[in-house]
A protein has these predicted regions:
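Aromatic-lined carbohydrate-recognition surfaces of secreted/lumenal glycan-active proteins
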Residues: 81-88, 92-93, 137-149, 155-179, ...
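Substrate-binding cleft and catalytic face of glycoside hydrolase catalytic domains
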Residues: 36-52, 66-147, 276-278
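Aromatic-rich peripheral "rim/lid" segments of glycoside hydrolase catalytic domains that contact
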Residues: 18, 260, 264-308
Length: 308
């Protein structure tokens, strides 16, 4: 597998957003300013609550097929390799890791089989698009921790995806959960979210290496990043953490992550989090405390690492 010098793009894009000239300019700037070679198009379908069994991927909350296909073609015209990553959010704000149902079916209660039927239909829809547009990889969702114990349903879902998409397939498990997935044999690439504290990377890499070694499959961090906020380098997954804007702390996180992972040949890339399809003004970077690296010191650190 080629080393993935990747960035997640377009997260939470709504219908019509990819039609805006600013969205294509953002994608061009991603390449120019970071040296990124792989762009991950992350899509967010919606379900009403963690116990809802119907997934909506056709509303105003998500780009439509035509604009997605057009943007993938545009990315490829720029020379990007493309990865499609459809996942799901919960409309009431609950994190998708808490999507959950009874292990044994109970009459009149929502059931795993109904949720997986809807989720698999959703995945099949985008697997067709990934195949038609020549995407180099397909990520069958991310960080759905409670679902991961349902190995049989996940195997069936992945098998249905493969009926439509014939390239490498992965699933993006959450930080610290690499050992929770018993069905890594059913994917081509193992991936997880690399939101690990600055200073703890060696410990986490030692742990992950022992878990994935028996599977003998490529591995990359399908997500990794850190807000530019005081305290975020110690809990980079917490997007709600309160703290002052701190561009240096974000830069230090990236330097540490790249330094430690570059010493492990089995780490074969990143899908950094994240590059917005509608960028803030570059002059506003000094006041921006989220995951964006646009116009911040971390942006230069990423480019130096990606182009070497």
């Amino acid at each position: 597998m080629d080393y993935i010098k990747g960035f997640t793009y377009g997260w939470m894009a709504r219908k019509g957003d990819f039609l805006k000239p600013e969205a294509k300019e953002s994608l061009r700037l991603l390449q120019e300013r970071t040296g990124t070679t792989h762009v991950i198009f992350a899509l967010a379908a919606l379900q009403d609550t963690p116990q809802s069994t119907s997934i909506d991927y056709t509303g105003q909350h998500i780009v439509d097929d035509e604009e997605l296909i057009d943007m993938i073609h545009y990315a490829r015209s720029l020379g990007f390799k493309t990865i499609l990553k459809p996942t799901v959010n919960v409309k009431d704000g609950t994190w998708r890791a808490h999507i959950n149902f009874f292990d044994l079916d109970v009459p009149c209660e929502p059931k795993w089989r109904d949720w997986f039927a809807s989720y698999t239909e959703y995945q099949e829809h985008y697997a067709v698009i990934a195949q038609a547009t020549g995407c180099e990889m397909y990520i069958a969702g991310c960080e759905m921790v409670q679902t991961e114990r349902r190995a049989d349903e996940w195997r069936q879902c992945l098998a249905k995806i493969r009926e439509h998409y014939h390239g490498p397939v992965t699933y993006n498990t959450d930080k610290y959960q690499e050992g929770n997935v018993s069905w890594w044999d059913a994917v081509d690439v193992i991936s997880s979210s690399g939101y690990y504290p600055l200073g703890d990377w060696d410990n986490q890499l030692d742990r992950i290496e022992k878990i994935i070694a028996p599977f003998n499959k490529p591995f990359f961090f399908a997500e990794a990043g850190c807000p530019s906020r005081t305290g975020s380098s110690q809990i980079p997954n917490d997007w709600n953490l309160e703290g002052d804007v701190n561009l240096k702390e974000q830069a230090d996180f990236y330097m540490d992550m790249f330094d430690k992972t570059s010493r492990r040949q089995w780490v074969q890339g990143f899908g950094l989090w994240d590059w917005r399809h509608l960028l803030h003004e570059e002059a506003d970077a000094v006041n921006n405390d989220d995951y964006s690296v646009y116009g911040k010191p971390a942006e230069k650190i990423i480019k130096e690492f990606y182009i070497k």
